[in-house]
């Protein structure tokens, strides 16, 4: 029986930071190791032959936080480190290039090991490339689709025909909490039973699962989840707010609309997969998640990861212009027209707008995301009671934070009501993928990210273990 492939795959190329901005890289793009953001920026600059100007002295610092402030200096750095449109097509790397790349990978891996060794217990660890997006078998989109369709990996070799190299890494992360719960006196006690009405939207198997939780434990859990959320966000909220003015121009919108349907689907599948990798790391850092059995960790991630992506999307949503951050700029629904999923896109944007209208803080987004992820009513759970207890504690922590933030009465109920909307969105996404797969089975099988296929493929039910 096929099963969900798990591996603590060692990061290879992705361990080397982006040569442009220093962010987490996703592979070799246009001949240089870069992140997805810089790859997309360079592609757009070449497609539009843009003539950027620098408002300063043409020596702007380009890093993860400043890369969107000066397009001129960012493009100059791309060119200076060797990014080139021709590099996409030059094929197999020379032995000298491979040896040089291998040496650099080894150097960064050694540096990573040294940092890990020096890491103090409880100290926050930055995101590592262990959950990053592997681009084996994937190259540039649209203009570069011909090379991609030939099925070559970035080093010019044919991809493996066996097990995919795309893995969901649920190996334990080091302690990320930075909090010391030892010695906290559990004086104030919250004892909530299902009969009390505190969990009106949760269906629990028996009254014995109701948690007895100290206020100190709730505070600790809330801090742990909030910290885990902030450490695993793709973008800081401040960065996103600074970029809201960078909306796609009409010419760029038409460029997306003219993409072949399969190319746009592939692009969106890659973007969703990238976001899900961050959700996986978020889950691993939540107190209690790694104590669940491996089967249940997988079930929760497979069933809930896209729901959390939709929740997190509200951070990157601009309700005033009805746009969302996508592929380097803010995009309206019309950017996604070539997908052929207008109803789904409309519903996703409507959900983002509605969630934005609740003006959730980062803490509240974090706890609601954790609550959604730890849903105890998922099929195939082996230790349902254990998951129920964890979800109940998270809901208590969410209510604790809402009360501490002086939120209006009824907001918890409104949030929990969003769960059914999230599930409807994800169900519709699966329906659209199934319809697309029926028309383009070879594209999905050969060219979509393997993790995306594992999460949303129609063989999900057959691949899950059967109890008893």
From Swiss-Prot:
SMART domains registered for this protein in UniProt: HOLI, ZnF_C4
Region of interest: AF-2: 444-455
Keywords: Activator, Biological rhythms, Developmental protein, DNA-binding, Metal-binding, Nucleus, Receptor, Transcription, Transcription regulation, Zinc, Zinc-finger
CDD domains found in the cross-reference section: NR_DBD_ROR, NR_LBD_ROR_like
Phenotype of the disrupted gene, per the record: Morpholino knockdown of the protein results in a reduced cerebellar area and smaller optic tecta area compared to control larvae. At 3 dpf, transgenic larvae present with a significantly decreased size of Purkinje and granule cell layers compared to controls.
Alphabetical list of PROSITE patterns matching this protein: NR_LBD, NUCLEAR_REC_DBD_1, NUCLEAR_REC_DBD_2
Positions of the NR LBD domain: 217-455
Pfam family, one: Hormone_recep
Region ranges (Disordered): 101-129, 142-163
Protein location: Nucleus
Keyword Metal-binding attributed: yes
GO cellular component: nucleus
Residue range(s) of DNA binding per entry: 15-90
Tissues expressing this chain: Expressed in the brain, in cerebellar-like structures, including Purkinje cells.
UniProt-recorded name of the protein: Nuclear receptor ROR-alpha A
């Amino acid at each position: 029986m096929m099963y969900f492939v798990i591996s603590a795959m060692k990061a290879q190329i992705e361990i080397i930071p982006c040569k442009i901005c220093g962010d987490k890289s996703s592979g070799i793009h246009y001949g240089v190791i870069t992140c997805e953001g810089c790859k997309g920026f360079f592609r757009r600059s070449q497609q539009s032959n843009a003539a950027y100007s620098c408002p300063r002295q043409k020596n702007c610092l380009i890093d993860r936080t400043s890369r969107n402030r000066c397009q001129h200096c960012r493009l100059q750095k791309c060119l200076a480190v060797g990014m080139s449109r021709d590099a996409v097509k030059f094929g197999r790397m020379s032995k000298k290039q491979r040896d040089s790349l291998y040496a650099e990978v080894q150097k960064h891996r050694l540096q990573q090991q040294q940092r890990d060794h020096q890491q103090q217990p409880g100290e926050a660890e930055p995101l590592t490339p262990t959950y990053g997006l592997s681009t084996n078998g994937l190259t540039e989109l649209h203009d570069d689709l011909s090379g991609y369709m030939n099925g070559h990996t970035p080093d010019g070799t044919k991809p493996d025909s066996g097990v995919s190299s795309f893995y969901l890494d649920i190996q334990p992360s080091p302690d990320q909490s930075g909090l010391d719960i030892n010695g906290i006196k559990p004086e104030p006690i919250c004892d909530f039973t299902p009969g009390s009405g505190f969990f009106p939207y949760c269906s629990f198997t028996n009254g014995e699962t109701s948690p007895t939780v100290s206020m100190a434990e709730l505070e600790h859990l809330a801090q742990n989840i909030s910290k885990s959320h902030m450490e695993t966000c793709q973008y800081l909220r401040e960065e996103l707010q600074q970029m809201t003015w960078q909306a796609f121009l009409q010419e760029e919108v038409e460029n997306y609309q003219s993409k072949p349907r399969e190319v746009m689907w592939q692009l969106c599948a890659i973007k969703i997969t990238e976001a899900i990798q961050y959700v996986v790391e978020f889950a691993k850092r939540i107190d209690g998640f790694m104590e669940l059995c491996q089967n249940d960790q997988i079930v929760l991630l497979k069933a809930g990861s896209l729901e959390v992506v939709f929740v997190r999307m509200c951070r990157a949503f601009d309700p005033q212009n009805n746009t969302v951050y996508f592929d380097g700029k803010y995009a309206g629904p019309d950017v996604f027209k070539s997908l052929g999923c207008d109803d789904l896109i409309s519903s996703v944007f409507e959900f983002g707008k509605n969630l934005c209208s609740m003006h959730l803080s980062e803490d509240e987004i974090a706890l609601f995301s954790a609550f959604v992820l730890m849903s105890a009513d998922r099929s195939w759970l082996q230790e349902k009671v254990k998951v129920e207890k964890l979800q109940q504690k998270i809901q208590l922590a969410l209510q604790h934070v809402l009360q501490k933030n002086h939120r209006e009465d009824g907001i918890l109920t409104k949030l929990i009501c969003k769960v059914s909307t999230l599930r409807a969105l994800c169900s519709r996404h699966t329906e659209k993928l199934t319809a697309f797969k029926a028309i383009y089975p070879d594209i999905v099988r050969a060219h979509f990210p393997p993790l995306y296929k594992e999460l949303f493929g129609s063989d999900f039910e057959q691949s899950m273990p059967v109890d008893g």
